[in-house]
A protein has these predicted regions:
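N-terminal Sec/ER secretory leader and immediately downstream segment
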Residues: 1-73
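Alpha-helical solenoid scaffolds that mediate protein-protein interactions
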Residues: 49-52, 56, 120, 139, ...
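Extended amphipathic alpha-helical interaction segments
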Residues: 77-160
Length: 218
């Protein structure tokens, strides 16, 4: 509670870039709510994702296969909800391609990834669970793929270049961590083999919070 982004702010965003980012943010909030058995919040976030998606000409996503109704009917079934969320993702990707809006895929993905990382960081700050830090550390492996996706469409929207710059800065900060350097020195190790030292991820968590603040500011 209090970590996810308020649905009341959804109407603040108007450009395609802003809407794509915030759709990603709300998608991550929806997933977090579902994982934490917060049914009402999950339904509220799905409704908001759909409303934002409609503004991006993605209304067909939720009409296909009764995704919206299926989600609401299966809130208590974790396996079913996982499948439905994956179906929503797949339908969104297909609709973006059909609409020739491929540049928005990376923007939505970046918004969702940053929000997920932000939530994990906030949970860690409150609870001090080192397993959360490990999960954050391992999820950083995804960042290069997001940056590559955004670069492929950089000329399509003026908002993409500053987002790439922020993510590149985060990547550089991560690469400078002692634990990451240990990975570089030992090619046989992967992310799950290395545990960051206590406090090592704190500056990174702050940077993630700063990027999230920039995203929700629009």
């Amino acid at each position: 509670p209090g970590i996810t982004y308020s649905v009341d702010k959804a109407s603040m965003y108007s450009t395609k870039f802003q809407l794509a980012q915030i759709m990603g943010v709300y998608s991550a909030d929806m997933a977090y709510s579902v994982l934490n058995k917060q049914s009402n919040e999950g339904q509220m976030y799905l409704k908001t994702v759909r409303e934002v998606g409609n503004k991006l000409n993605l209304s067909k996503v939720f009409d296909q296969g009764n995704l919206f109704d299926r989600f609401n009917a299966n809130m208590e079934n974790e396996d079913s909800i996982g499948t439905i969320v994956a179906d929503i993702q797949y339908a969104t990707d297909n609709q973006l391609a059909e609409n020739q809006q491929n540049e928005l895929y990376g923007v939505i993905f970046a918004g969702a990834w940053i929000e997920s990382m932000y939530i994990a960081g906030e949970v860690y700050k409150k609870e001090g669970n080192e397993n959360v830090v490990q999960a954050l550390f391992e999820q950083m492996a995804v960042l290069n793929s997001i940056i590559t996706e955004l670069k492929a469409y950089e000329t399509k929207d003026p908002g993409i270049t500053p987002l790439i710059a922020q993510l590149n800065s985060l990547q550089a900060q991560f690469d400078a961590l002692p634990s990451v350097k240990k990975l570089d020195e030992n090619p046989d190790l992967d992310f799950s083999d290395v545990k960051p030292e206590k406090g090592e991820m704190d500056p990174l968590i702050k940077t993630i919070g700063d990027i999230r603040a920039a995203i929700v500011k629009g």
